[in-house]
Structures are given as C-alpha cells and as structure tokens.
Regions:
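Flexible gly/pro-rich beta->alpha loop and the following alpha-helix that scaffold active-site loops
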Residues: 64-117
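Short glycine-rich anion-binding loops that position phosphate/pyrophosphate groups of nucleotides
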Residues: 11, 89-92, 124
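Class I SAM-dependent methyltransferase SAM-binding "motif I" and its flanking Rossmann-like core
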Residues: 96-98, 105-164
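Class I S-adenosyl-L-methionine
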Residues: 39-77
Length: 222
C-alpha cells in the first residue's frame, strides 16, 4: 500500500491543497478521521482548527482521542477503525511519552503501512520521524534533546517553526549529529507531503534545507 505522510511546521489548520489531498486519501479508506491530542482545558474549542478545512472537503466523521485521559487500549481501538489520523501540536515530550512509548505506536505504524494517511502538526510532525528531535526552545530544560520517534520517515531530520523560532542552528546541530540523507526546516503555515517516503509537494510559507553546508529555500509546490 502507498504510504501518505503530511508534516506541518506549526499548528493547524491544514493548508488548502494538502487538506484536499489528505481528505482524498481518507475517503478511499471510509472517511473517518481520528485526532490524537493532549488533554488540556477547553481542548474541544480548538478542534475546529483541525477539522474545518477537512469538512470543506467532505469529511464528516471525527473521533477525538485526548491523552492520557483516553487509555492506550481505547485509543488503539479507535485508531484501528480510522481512515485518517491527525497527531496534534503541543508539548513534544508529552506526545512522545503518551504515543511513542505506548502500544499506540504499534497501531500507528500498522495503519500507516496499510495506507491510512497520517498528518502531524508541530510536535505531531516531530514524533513521526525516526529521531524525534526537540529544540532547546521547545522544552523546559532549554537544551537540545532527542529520542526515538515513530519512524514513519527515516533518514530524515526536521525542524518546525523554522523561521519563526530562528532554528537554523538547531537544524545544523541535528544534521551534524545524525548525518541524515535529507533535512527540512518547516515554517508555520506550511506543510510537506510525502508519498512512500518521497517528498512530492509542499504548500504554504517557507521550507528550507541544508545542502553542502548552505541553507537554501525549497521552491517546489504541490
């Protein structure tokens, strides 16, 4: 099965063309989307930011999985019955704790391999990688951190909120440490679409990469 991965450099919403592409893949699997998010006060009020652009594309069924309130077992059941999966933004280390380090991770990998599209926003994008790399600007200790991710995209490192947080030095550190084949700095309001581990389109603001030790902007559009 084709594997569809959407990585956004900030919070929701989906960009318009990527929303259309995500919804297209969801519809081929039945049309039901699950949202993995962190439990926080009034979280329900924030959900339309994720769902409105998909509703415009005809998606009507959404199942919300606030963690850790919903158990890993119940979350896994919902995910197995989903046609598309969104991993939200927030505290990256908590997303890793409640998803990567639990049985939820196995279900996500299985669904992804079976062709169910997965979209990550900010922290959700970071945990999709083989190495979940957390910026010093994104944790209480204010240090560069990394841990295992879901491994949906391998041999690649990313930095999110790239221009907004001035993250070139962070991306350089990640590239130097892990020597990946590919690297991307993704701005807010920007998404990348990977089909079978290959970048085939982007939409939104800036996407950057380090090539021959020089930072360059990627101009590809969807």
């Amino acid at each position: 099965m084709d594997r569809h991965l959407f990585l956004f450099g900030g919070g929701p919403p989906f960009t318009s063309k990527l929303a259309k592409q995500f919804a297209k893949q969801v519809s081929t699997h039945g049309g039901k989307v699950a949202l993995l998010i962190l439990e926080r006060a009034n979280w329900q009020e924030y959900m339309p930011k994720y769902t409105n652009t998909l509703m415009e594309q005809g998606i009507r069924e959404f199942n919300y999985i606030p963690l850790p309130t919903v158990s890993a077992e119940e979350a896994s059941r919902i995910l197995r019955n989903s046609s598309g999966i969104i991993i939200g933004g927030g505290n990256t280390e908590l997303y890793a704790e409640f998803i990567v380090k639990t049985p939820i991770s196995k279900v996500l990998k299985e669904q992804f391999s079976d062709g169910v599209p997965i979209a990550g926003f900010s922290a959700g994008s970071l945990i999709c990688m083989d190495k979940c790399i957390v910026s010093a600007k994104d944790n209480a200790d204010q240090v560069f951190k990394y841990q295992a991710g879901l491994g949906l995209l391998k041999d690649t490192v990313i930095a999110v909120h790239f221009s907004e947080w001035i993250e070139e030095s962070h991306l350089r550190k990640a590239v130097t440490l892990f020597q990946p084949s590919l690297n991307f700095g993704i701005d807010e309001g920007t998404g990348l679409y990977f089909l079978n581990n290959k970048l085939i389109g982007r939409e939104g603001n800036g996407v950057f990469r380090l090539k021959n030790n020089q930072l360059e902007k990627i101009e590809m559009q969807l």
